[in-house]
Amino acid sequence: MLNIHNEWDERYSQHDHIYGEQANAFIQDITQKLSIHGKTLGLAEGEGRNLLYLAALAQANGQAFEADLWDYSQVALDKAQGYAQQRGLSLNTRKQDLSQVDWPANQYDNVICVFGHFNPETQQKVLNGVRETLVNGGLFVGELYSTRQLEYKTGGPRAVEMLYDPIEFLSHFKHDHLIHFFVGDVERSEGKLHQGKSHVIQFAIRIQK
């Protein structure tokens, strides 16, 4: 049986832009309201579509942007680097098992996570780690599938424990400022694997330490 790293390598080897070439729709929407620039970490960011969108936007606005991409798959990381070079953008990549991170404190201005789904133990580690690694006033932004997504069968893991409960998710950020928080139905068309009505959690959270 393939291990998780090789499963993701195989998935990313099969097609280009398996989750689409454009950034996630919520990431595009929230940047109309929030300026996301500075040192930015993309978690489980695959081929880099969201980070590259943010990097290009910051460049167009004359803002500094440093992009770090962490993912399980070396194939995805290599493709992300290639796409960055094609667009004249800079991207730092790291092959990272998110269950085994020594999170650096106060390191990032922003963390983004779009459809980054993990087992319950790793979910806890990641959400706690995100808060640790963001600076005071830093932003955590993203879109995830909620536990109700199992009913929809339009993308994401097929095990409920890999999905997110909104109340449990919020418990990690009870001292922080919710700029945007939405739980409900959206239509998504992002590559072959995310198609149709979906039940998501959207968030933009400003960390207050």
Q: Model-found features: residue ranges?
A:
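Short alpha-helix
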Residues: E161-F182
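Class I SAM-dependent methyltransferase SAM/SAH-binding core
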Residues: K39-L41, G48-S99
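A short glycine-rich, Lys/Arg-flanked "PGG" loop and its adjoining helix->strand segment in the class I
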Residues: Q124-N136
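A short SAM/SAH-binding and catalytic strip from SAM-dependent methyltransferases
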Residues: D109-Q123
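Conserved class I S-adenosyl-L-methionine
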Residues: M1-S35, R148
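Conserved beta-strand signature within the Rossmann-like core of class I S-adenosyl-L-methionine
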Residues: G137-Y145
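A short acidic, Gly/Pro-enriched loop at the edge of an enzyme's catalytic core
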Residues: V101-N110
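Core SAM-dependent methyltransferase catalytic element
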Residues: S189-K209
